[in-house]
Design a protein with these regions (language model features):
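Catalytic core segments in nucleotide and nucleic-acid processing enzymes
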Residues: 1-121
Length: 121
C-alpha cells in the first residue's frame, strides 16, 4: 500500500524524492504543540519520499505570531530531519455577520499564509 501526503514540493521525476512534504490537518493545534500521531504520520511520509522537511498545516483561530511552531527530529547521525507546523488563520467573526466581510478577511489570511509558506520552502 502506498502512502501520500496532501502536497509534495520538488517531487523528482522518478517520484522517489521530494524536497518537502506538506500535510493539511483540519483540527487546530492544541497548546501542547505537535500531536504525536501527526508527527509519526509526517515522518512516514518524509521517509517514503526521502525528504528532510515536513510541514503540517493547521487551522488557527487567532491571528498571532504563535501560528508557526517548529520541532526538529534527528533520525540519523548524518541527517537532520525537521517537521514544522504552519497555522492558517480562520477568521472567527464577520462585520455585522456579513459573508462578504468573512471572504475578505479569509483572502487576507490566505495571502499571509502563502507568504509564510513560501518563506519556509
Amino acid at each position: 500500500r502506498t502512502i501520500y501526503p496532501d502536497f509534495l514540493w520538488g517531487l523528482s521525476e522518478d517520484k522517489f524524492y521530494a524536497k518537502a512534504v506538506l500535510d493539511a490537518k483540519y483540527k487546530p493545534l492544541d497548546d501542547k504543540g505537535l500531536d504525536r500521531n501527526d508527527a509519526y504520520q509526517m515522518l512516514a511520509y518524509m521517509l517514503r519520499f526521502d525528504s528532510k522537511r515536513g510541514y503540517l498545516i493547521y487551522p488557527q483561530k487567532y491571528n498571532d505570531k504563535n501560528g508557526l511552531y517548529s520541532k526538529k527530529y534527528d533520525l540519523y547521525r548524518d541527517r537532520n530531519i525537521f517537521i514544522q507546523t504552519i497555522g492558517l488563520h480562520i477568521p472567527q467573526t464577520a462585520k455585522e455577520g456579513k459573508y462578504e466581510h468573512f471572504c475578505s478577511e479569509m483572502q487576507k489570511a490566505e495571502e499571509d499564509f502563502i507568504k509564510r509558506l513560501r518563506d519556509c520552502l
